[in-house]
Every structure is written in C-alpha cells, then in structure tokens.
Design a protein with these regions (language model features):
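Mature, function-bearing regions of proteins
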Residues: 1-154, 158-316
Length: 316
C-alpha cells in the first residue's frame, strides 16, 4: 500500500511538472500545444518518419540547448539581429515568440505534408512584412527582408548546426545515418519557405558556416539581445535550469564565436556530463509521454505507414 501511495504521488507530481513545462513552451494555459490539431490532422504522412534523424533529434530534450545556441548564432549576424529587434515580440511577449518558433519546428517535423504546407504559408506571410535596413559588418547600410534567401539560409544553418551539435554533445540517442542524414533530410523543411539550395551534407554546412563568418559582427544591439537571451523573463522556478542550459549552449559554440559573444569560455568537458544528467532529470520529471509524437504516430498508423509501432512503408 505504501508503494502504491508513493507511486500515485509521483504520478501526480509528474503530471503537474509536465503541465507547467508545456505551459512554458506552448504559452497555452492548459499546457496543450495549440498546434496539436495540425499534427493529428489528415491521414497523410509527413516529411519525416520516427526512425529518421530529424524526428529523433527534435524529439530529444537536447533541442532546448540547441535552441539557445541557435539564437546566439543568429544574434551575431546583423541581418537576422535587426529582424529580431525590429519586428519580433521577443521583449514584450518572449514566451509567445518562443512558442511561435516551437510551433514551426514541431509542425514541420511531425505533421502531415498538408499541415507543413499550411504552416509554411503562415511563416511566409509573416516574413513578407519583415523588411527594413541593417548595417553590415563593414559598415554598409543595405535593405533586408526576412524572405531574402541569403538571410533565410543563415537562420536555417544556425538552427541546423545548433540542433545537430547539441544532439551530438548532449544526447545519448544516436542519429540514424549520422550528421549527413540529418542535414540532408532536414533540408526539406525550408523548401516550402523558398530556400531550395540548403546544405545537403555536414561538409557543405561547415563550408556555409565559414562563408558567413566575415558577415558576423558585435554591436551594442547584439549585446542587448545576447543579454536578453542570457536572462530572459522566465518564471523564477525555471531560471536555475535555464541558466545552466545557457552555459551548455555557450560551451558548445566554437571558440571564436564565444570570443565575439564575450561571456567567457565555459568548459565543455565539465558541463557535458552534468547537462546530460540534467536533461535526463527533466525528462524524468515531466514523464516520457509526448502528446505531439503520440499524435503523429497515430496519424502514421492511419496512413498505413506504420503498423504495431513499426515503420512498414518508406516514402519516395
């Protein structure tokens, strides 16, 4: 009876923590992702399957570290930085902006092709209004648009490189096909956004990262956004874990990026084992269930792509 009571208490606590965690990520007062319906909708397959690299990477909590890392990378490019500062609600509604980014990533990874297309249309409509001027690293003022393939490619590379690196460093789950498979498959995610020349291998991605390096710069505006990324207005209970994950994200960046950011050089060899344990602890606290994954898998069973939990058909 004692064990049963303890088990019941643990389950209740886990449900409470899981709800609070999902409220934080989705902005929904009930912790139900508003885009869950898009994941469930239709009897069609999506871009990815449960045994493919993008699905496995984005279902892993290491994406929390990767997301922070991607924001730091994007802040170093004057174009993407200006878009965030001028058109984003990151200051007035930080959780709303976070949930918007999570929505695109989640729908694109787990939803049907029809839902992915609808989500891309939503993002493209927003991008159509994001226009202005920014000052390059060389001091030249130029026009920009969020739909500009050059800036869109940088944002894509920053997310892709960050999710990949943080999965390699902080996750214990191997990626089927390795880095090349993740990059090649995830390139499909940005085709509906108008980017049809994304990197298709790790070598191509690293070459692109190096090509953008001369365009990166640090200004007072950069420092302002980095300070916000380091100290976002999150609930007090979430701040200790977030601060640790921020250090883990910073530690995963190349040394020259760390130098530009100017917040020191956290020791990766020290942070890595503790970050792996922290992510496992968070998973234990919120429980192994994922409403998003479960809905996607149910849809794939309806579509005849899966049977009894296993992939039985491959997409062309």
């Amino acid at each position: 009876m004692l064990l049963s009571s303890r088990s019941l208490t643990n389950n209740i606590l886990q449900k409470i923590l899981s709800k609070r965690f999902r409220i934080l990520l989705t902005g929904d007062p009930d912790g139900v992702p508003p885009w869950l319906g898009a994941i469930e909708a239709s009897d069609e397959p999506g871009l990815f399957l449960p045994d493919e690299a993008p699905w496995i990477a984005h279902a892993d909590l290491a994406t929390m570290v990767g997301g922070i890392r991607a924001l730091l990378m994007q802040a170093l490019h004057p174009g993407s930085l200006t878009g965030v500062r001028t058109h984003s609600r990151y200051k007035n509604d930080p959780l709303g902006r976070l949930s918007g980014t999570i929505r695109w990533l989640t729908v694109t990874t787990f939803a049907s092709t029809a839902s992915v297309s609808a989500e891309a249309d939503r993002v493209n409509r927003m991008h159509a209004h994001v226009k202005g001027k920014y000052t390059t690293a060389s001091g030249k003022s130029i026009d920009y648009s969020a739909a500009d393939p050059h800036l869109l490619r940088w944002v894509h590379i920053a997310f892709m490189d960050s999710f990949l690196r943080c999965h390699q460093i902080y996750s214990t789950r191997p990626l089927p096909g390795g880095a090349d498979a993740y990059i090649r498959l995830w390139s499909k995610s940005v085709t509906p956004l108008g980017l049809d020349d994304a990197p298709m291998s790790e070598a191509e991605m690293l070459s692109e990262v190096a090509r953008y390096r001369p365009e990166l710069a640090v200004t007072e505006e950069t420092r302002e956004v980095i300070r916000w990324i380091k100290n976002p207005p999150l609930p007090a209970a979430a701040l200790p874990a977030y601060s640790f994950l921020f250090q883990a994200a910073l530690a995963s960046l190349p040394r020259d990026y760390q130098d530009m950011i100017g917040l020191g050089h956290p020791p990766l060899h020290v942070l890595r084992p503790f970050t792996v344990k922290l992510l496992k602890l968070i998973r234990l606290a919120i429980g192994p269930e994922s409403p998003i994954e479960e809905a996607a898998i149910v849809r794939l069973h309806r579509a005849g792509i899966m049977e009894e939990g296993k992939v039985t058909q491959r997409q062309k």
